[in-house]
Curated annotation (Swiss-Prot):
Keyword Phosphoprotein appears in the UniProt entry: no
PANTHER family, per database record: PHENYLALANINE--TRNA LIGASE BETA SUBUNIT, PHENYLALANYL-TRNA SYNTHETASE BETA CHAIN AND LEUCINE-RICH REPEAT-CONTAINING PROTEIN 47
Chain ranges of the tRNA-binding domain: 38-148
Species: Carboxydothermus hydrogenoformans (strain ATCC BAA-161 / DSM 6008 / Z-2901)
Coiled-coil regions listed: none
Enzyme kind, highest EC tier: ligase
One Pfam family this sequence matches: tRNA_bind
Designated name of the protein: Phenylalanine--tRNA ligase beta subunit
Primary residence: cytoplasm
Amino acid sequence: MNISYNWLQEFCEIPYTAQELGEKLTSVGIAVEKVTYIGNYEKVVVGEVLEVENLPGTELFKTKVSTGKEIFEVVTGAKNVFAGFKYPFALPGAKLPNGITIEERRIRGVVSQGMLLSAEELGLLERKGAEPGLMLLPPEAPVGEKIEKVLELDDYLLELDLTPNRGDCLSVLGVAREVAALTGHRLKLAEPELPLDNGSCPVSIEIQNPELCGRYMGIVIKNVKVGPSPLWLEQRLRKAGIRPINNIVDVTNYILLEYGQPLHAFDLDKLASPEIIVRNARAGEKITTLDGVERELTSEMLVIADREKPIAVAGIMGGQNTEVDDDTKTVFIEAAWFNPVSVRKTARKLGLRTDASQRFEKNVDIEGIKRALIKAALMICELAGGTIQGRYGDVYPKKFTPKVIAVSLSRAEEFLGISLDAKRVVEILESLGFRVTIGEKKIFVEVPSYRPDVSLEADIYEEIARYLGYNNFPDTMPIGITTTGFSPEYNFEYKVKNLLTALGMQEIITYSFINPDSYNKLGLSVDEVLTKSVVLLNPLSIEQSVMRTTLLPGLLDIAKRNENRQQENLLLFEMGNVFEKNGEDLPKETKLIGGIALGYRYGDWYNKPRKYDFYYVKGILESLFTSLGINNFSFSAAKDLPFLHPGKAARVYLENTEIGYLGELHPLVQKKYEFKNTPLVFELNYDLLKTLIPAEKKYTPLSPYPEVKRDIALLVEREIPAATFIEVIKGLAINTLKNIEIFDVYEGEKLGPNKKSIAISLTFSSTEKTLSEEEINNFMAQVLKALEAKTGAKLRTF
């Protein structure tokens, strides 16, 4: 927001330059990003046109322009150039804000000695709806005077970068309060009063939802004449970046800037009845707002309505059906307090943020509404020639009660780490508008209505610290702080990430918001997935409009982006949350670990680089589980995952609980992403993984006795997974069986149709004795018997 230095001086005497003021405000937490002088106009003055004549054969005009000292001959194409009128005039050598330097030049045989200017050429906003042409200056403008003096541009703008809690400083008055506290000078704030009359407000006001509208005031002004505002008012708006419209609307915008109170003007004759109803919109109700857009409302939104229809979206924008135009004769001026949360939600749902909604969202001064409304009414009467009809209407269901905070100075000293002078503390708080009552052990601070951000004792400490000056606080080292260890959850997460990094993977972090088209690329039903997905109401873009239910889209996008940049060999992982709808409650969050392998793994002096494959990624997961102390893991073929190759995919189990999958990306998905090499991916449920980690590791001493290995070759049906044989053998619970390893699988014609040979190595060992041949043979017999009974396996003898 831009604040005029000159305008601030109307509220408070300022002993600082604009630059110094910016630094002072920043030091007390009102950040001033930059201070800009806006009167940089050289050789641009008020010019009076003395004569106008047409240039033969053209649509141009030859004029004589006086600067009081000299007369210049100027050619212009503007249609609104008339003798006796005054306009901004650029002398030869003048440099305009758009970078153009004005020089004498010949136009159609006439030497033009300068240029008459429009508002746009001066870098100013044109009045809305104004005919294009020269900027007309008031008759009283002194001929030859510098244009920055006449247009009040001999001024500085302070560009503020406010924190969200300081909505009170979104106005000249709010900043002036801070300036008064800084300087110690009195704040000049008059309370305008209406002339006495005996009538009441001719418009009835009804608030149906006091929670969303805490106060509503209005006043009727009749016999107004809508037209352009005086130059000084237009210039105040222009300096703040607001385009002038007409004297009625300009006054409401002026009050918005000066007091921070949004107002709205209705054409009273366009209302169906002389009544204002503040109510919730009805489901499906529509309104065309002033920007010409028809908007559908919901029952959560607050509207201003007459007897028949909505006429404004409360706190955001008025409707076209009651817009003030050139034919308006009677206006109703609204000033109100609307619930900040309600305004914010409505603005977000409608995708409509305005200067008014910005202020309502940050809470306006409910006690300052009357001051703003009365001043606006008096200004309209002065500038538009109207008269106030009756009194103002004021519906105020629950009067404001100031919050009183008990403040202990000893606790404040402990909090701030410095000694405080009670008298100075009271001075600071009173200069900021707080009322202070001194008690025996505490002071009691009454918070003004325009500071809703102050609600706790700690907030008062902050106010004190701001004006004591943070630079005056001594540097001290922390005392008595002991370090604490990391939580078990953090330690486990750190361990998993370290293990994956040790296995050659690199961690990435991607956005939680994805493009819904990502599901289509993965071969999933978009409609089906979206029923479970959290869809954003107001996304930054369609590419980030849905919260992810899987980590795959982010992993694949990053891998493809790197491949496009010739980084084709990747081994990446991500640990992050995915989100799923959970009825009316907050979304369900689950933490997953996802990974992707692409291209070739690095070779060495005796091995050439080899492509990442299914077994390499499977080996990463096996190593991870083993390092975490998990031995009871298994894999089973998965043919029903649409984004994975049906013959090169598996589900991952820990203790018979499915926790994820791995596999090669489906060829169709690979084609959609246009990968050159085939990606391998995996995804594990991290939250489940945490619960399946053994509570503690038990020490098992090494056996001093020799191990015995036996190999068997089995003839089995081709479709039986290799893991089945391991599960059957483990199910025998032979306590001396230490290791089971499948070391060969063979298929050939001599085995017979749909048959394969699988070779298994078994390792036996005891910590108590050397196992005898008879014991080993007995164990092997148990194994063969169980395998034959449960899988139909036969001992292969050929």
